[in-house]
């Protein structure tokens, strides 16, 4: 199995367009080895020829330009991307579909909840159904795509930001709002969980002894943006576990014996983006890697 990290940042990328915090400033100036990052998405292939795109980032075109494996290979129109699978209806997971409207055939797979969100917004009709079939999947049921078995499963999360005002106060929403994926090529298996609000017993059992896990790395600490004075929202309010702390991701994964653990979906304020920071050193000492755009893994 081949995995390419197309984008590694949370919504808005790194640096976000209007962010002038110290973490973003390093990315603007590209000092101290800081890397600019696009919004989180990965591509996965069993054979290196047919690819499944996991989430369609607003930075989709930039990500394709940076990834020769996903360039057109033959004919007048072609893409190695044969399927797109969405793990949520968040803006940074769906907007890239609008850049995939040029009469190219692929299949689009999502929960019924997310497909309903797309259907409610006529702008997504630009993704012509004559070329792009929208196919709902069932949770915990393997889906065969391009030589891979992809199994979507529910994790704690929340409704998309643009749906909060219509949620009636129930920000958690349905069990189809926020999903993880188990991806299996018949030999090796990985898990992709770009958003998760809490570790549950079911998730703990699923990830025990895993070979590879990409996991929500949005914030280092729950009140990170509050302490910086740029927002009143905590990580929990946004539907994300934080990396540090007694209820954080590092602590939750400590007993799970995961061979390779990689943080993805990193907010522009997160100090682990600075490879010279004590937070980055702490994450690495705990056995974690920090994803970057262009990271490739052969599993």
Curated annotation (Swiss-Prot):
Pfam families: Lactamase_B_2
GO biological process, one term: pyrroloquinoline quinone biosynthetic process
Alphabetized UniProt keyword annotations: PQQ biosynthesis, Transport
Pathway: Cofactor biosynthesis; pyrroloquinoline quinone biosynthesis
Signal peptide: none
InterPro entries tied to this protein: Metallo-B-lactamas, PQQ_synth_PqqB, RibonucZ/Hydroxyglut_hydro
Reported function: May be involved in the transport of PQQ or its precursor to the periplasm.
PANTHER family in the cross-refs: COENZYME PQQ SYNTHESIS PROTEIN B, HYDROLASE C777.06C-RELATED-RELATED
Family, similarity comment: Belongs to the PqqB family.
Official protein name in the record: Coenzyme PQQ synthesis protein B
Name of the coding gene: pqqB
